Amino acid sequence: MPLREVDKVEVTCLVDNNVDVLLPNTEVAHRPFLAKNWYERPLIAEHGFSAAVTVELGGRKHRVLLDSGLDPLAAAHNADVLDFDLSNCELVISSHGHIDHAGGLLNIRKKMNTRQRIPLVLHEDAFRNRMVKFQDGRTISLPAPSKSFLTKAGYEIIEKHSQSLWIDDGILVTGEIPRTNNFEKGFPNHYSEVEEGQMENDPLIKDDQAVIVNVKDKGLVIITGCGHAGIINTLNHAKELTGEDRIYAVVGGMHLTGGLFEPIITRTVHELERLRPKFVVPCHCSGLKAMSEIARKMPDAFIQNSVGTNYIF
């Protein structure tokens, strides 16, 4: 069954590394309305990502959640500040198992229907403990989400390696993304626990996956968490999976921040230009240098993200 076209999709950013209350609205980016007392309960930015995806299909609206940020409370807090209703959320998708995308899963579940289990779609590798080792000796621990805690919280765990269709075939989750080019080589100093206490180098992060929606008369809207598979690999795979060449919008992390990834920014942006998306919204781990280069080379497509922005495509 192919991916069905939807009439409209909205992507609402609940968690990102940046919040800027002064950004203007654009053709597709609708910034949150600020109440008079906005400073008493401000939107929170952090090193993490979460976005709600709402599609209109067959005269009905359907809402799903991609990722849940780092802090246990941030996504839920921002949803409250935005008065954003998650009680009708039908599905949660985990882009991968890193804590900055899975840290809020337990608390955000309380905002959803508690009378039924909510499917949580993810790759089995998402349950591996991870870490990042820097050349200067520093390490960052990336503890895995707890399958038992998630089940107790009311999720139905659904582990998928390959692509899967959801919401009346209107949302496609990519599953594992093939690495087909010669410059997006993964995360070389990333490690995964293969047995208790035993870490092995894991540059590919195979659990990385993205969400694809095909908007009628426009093309693909592709939402990533971190884009560890490489944003160009991800976009090309989306085209291959759907048979649709038009890319209308790209929203999410591109993992181009830091010294390991900055050398491929120029090549990545060049390839992104060739793919000709109408809108590019780099988030989270994309990094200032990559965002600046996208803005310079693709000024009509680039949109600066901020927590609370609602994109309507």
Give the role of each language-model region.
Residues 125-209, 273, 303-312:
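Metallo-beta-lactamase
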Residues 18-21, 73, 127-129, 179-183, ...:
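Short, acidic Gly/Pro/Ser/Thr-rich loop/turn segments
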Residues 1-31, 164-174:
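N-terminal amphipathic/basic leader segments beginning at the initiator methionine
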Residues 98-102, 119, 199-307:
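Cap/insert and terminal regions of metallo-dependent hydrolase folds
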Residues 17-20, 25-82, 204, 208-224:
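Conserved beta-strand hairpin/beta-sheet module of binuclear metal-dependent hydrolase folds
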Residues 73-121, 242-249:
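Active-site metal-binding motif and surrounding structural segment of the metallo-beta-lactamase
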Residues 10-14, 64-67, 171-177, 220-226:
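Active-site-proximal beta-strand elements of phosphoester/diester hydrolases
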Residues 24-25, 131-135, 262, 294:
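Short acidic, glycine/serine/threonine-rich loops at helix termini
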